[in-house]
């Protein structure tokens, strides 16, 4: 049964909200860097990863890949009117500092930088050391 060609549903475009203060969550692991920009309540405004930015394999875990990922997340966040950022960094990866520098050079006012890396009180056994 084919739909009637003449009828169209009235679809209203979702209005973009304006968020001035936001939080940038940078998860820098040894293999990848994930940058997520959220509003104050934690609702995601934009995100980008080093792997999703076109880097594959060992190039994903470089500071340059983290810089590109932070720039891409920042571009989308600018559309929401974001001006001020609080940065939360998690993980020991190589993209920690370069992601912050990229967000700063993208034109955001960075209010605070917080390291929220989870530190175990002798929890899980770590992976065995590499023998190359």
From Swiss-Prot:
Species, as recorded: Dichelobacter nodosus (strain VCS1703A)
Entries under Pfam families matching the protein: Ribosomal_S11
InterPro entries: Ribosomal_uS11, Ribosomal_uS11_bac-type, Ribosomal_uS11_CS, Ribosomal_uS11_sf
GO CC term, one of those recorded: ribosome
Biological role: Located on the platform of the 30S subunit, it bridges several disparate RNA helices of the 16S rRNA. Forms part of the Shine-Dalgarno cleft in the 70S ribosome.
Subunit-structure text: Part of the 30S ribosomal subunit. Interacts with proteins S7 and S18. Binds to IF-3.
Listed GO biological process terms: translation
Record keywords, A-Z: Ribonucleoprotein, Ribosomal protein, RNA-binding, rRNA-binding
Molecular function per GO: rRNA binding; structural constituent of ribosome
Family: Belongs to the universal ribosomal protein uS11 family.
Protein name, entry field: Small ribosomal subunit protein uS11
Covalent S-S links between cysteines: none
Domain of life, source organism: Bacteria
């Amino acid at each position: 049964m084919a739909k009637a060609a003449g009828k169209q549903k009235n679809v209203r475009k979702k209005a973009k909200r304006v968020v001035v203060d936001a939080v940038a969550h940078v998860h820098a692991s040894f293999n990848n860097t994930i940058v997520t920009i959220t509003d104050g309540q934690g609702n995601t405004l934009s995100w980008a990863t080093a792997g999703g930015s076109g880097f594959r394999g060992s190039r994903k875990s470089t500071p340059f890949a983290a810089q590109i990922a932070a720039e891409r997340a920042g571009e989308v966040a600018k559309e929401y009117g974001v001006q001020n950022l609080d940065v939360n960094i998690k993980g020991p990866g190589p993209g920690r500092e370069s992601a912050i520098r990229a967000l700063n050079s993208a034109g955001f006012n960075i209010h605070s930088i917080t390291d929220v890396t989870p530190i175990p009180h002798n929890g899980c056994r770590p992976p065995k050391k590499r023998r190359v």
